[in-house]
Regions:
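Short alpha-helical catalytic segment bearing the HExxH-like zincin motif
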Residues: 87, 91, 108, 134, ...
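Acidic/His-rich, divalent-metal-binding segments that scaffold phosphate/diphosphate chemistry
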Residues: 27-105
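Short hydrophobic transmembrane-like helices used for membrane targeting/insertion
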Residues: 8, 13-14, 24-26
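An active-site-proximal "capping" alpha-helix that borders the catalytic cofactor pocket
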Residues: 67-70, 105-119
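Histidine/acidic-rich helix-loop-helix segments that form or flank divalent-metal centers
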Residues: 123-184
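Terminal helices and disordered tails flanking the catalytic cores of nucleotide-processing hydrolases
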Residues: 159-245
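Extended, compositionally biased eukaryotic interaction scaffolds
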Residues: 35, 44-54, 75, 79, ...
Length: 245
């Protein structure tokens, strides 16, 4: 069959590369990176580390959310399928640096991603684009530098939800826990006609005051505004029906 013939041909190529000490390049897709053992171990270890440090969930579920939100944003604004795929790959990998250290995790993640991506059949330009997006996603050291990084930033910083709070007694919640737990509803809406990206939050003010929310998230929301500007759009934030940003 055709499939059997392709398998035999692939095996011959691998054997040839082993004999001649040449690298076997693997075509890359979002599906592939989601099933990359090294990437998933880094995400698992990073999430464990952050759990011990008291941070909210940064598991694969968060990374999938970021990847798919970034892709949705670019798709709505008619970016190419190629750019969308790069954003999904960068979005899924963006937090691998937490396995090394939370501080400068974006830069560590970029360095790790650069080495991991070398085993795939990616152009140098695409690899650098992904690495740059990962390295610039943290509000303390980065910012949007191109549409891929801009979409990743918005996908990451708008992932505010109750389910990201780890299971623990409510009495032990810190401000980050309270802020996320207080968000009872979150929607990200994209109006392509008006070129507006809107984050709409419903916050239980009995759990967290609006002041506490902005104490934690103001810089992240301002980063989203900068990312939206790069995309040629406007970022708006609404909390409990009132326009905030």
């Amino acid at each position: 069959s055709c499939r059997a013939s392709l398998a035999v041909s692939a095996l011959r190529i691998v054997r040839y590369c082993l004999r001649t000490n040449r690298k076997v390049w693997i075509a890359m897709t979002y599906h592939d990176i989601k099933h990359n053992a090294e990437v998933n171990e880094l995400l698992k270890k990073g999430n464990q580390n952050l759990g011990l440090l008291g941070f909210t969930d940064h598991s694969q579920a968060h990374c999938i959310h970021v990847a798919e939100t970034a892709a949705h944003i670019l798709k709505k604004f008619d970016y190419s399928a190629h750019d969308i795929e790069l954003a999904k790959i960068a979005g899924y990998m963006h937090d691998i640096g937490n396995a090394i250290n939370r501080t400068h995790h974006a830069e560590y993640g970029g360095l790790l991603a650069n080495e991991i991506l070398k085993q795939y059949d990616l152009s140098v330009a695409d690899r650098i684009t992904i690495v740059s997006a990962i390295s610039n996603h943290d509000e303390s050291t980065g910012g949007a530098v191109d549409p891929i990084s801009a979409a990743l930033i918005i996908g990451d910083k708008t992932d505010v939800r109750r389910s990201r709070v780890r299971e623990k007694p409510k009495a032990s919640f810190d401000i980050h826990d309270r802020v996320n737990y207080a968000v009872t509803d979150q929607t990200l809406k994209i109006n392509t006609d008006k070129k507006v990206i809107s984050l709409n939050l419903q916050i239980d003010t009995d759990i967290c005051s609006m002041y506490e929310y902005f104490e934690i998230f103001l810089n992240r929301m301002l980063m989203c505004r900068g990312a939206a500007d790069l995309l040629g759009t406007t970022f708006k934030l609404t909390a409990n029906g009132a326009k905030v940003l």
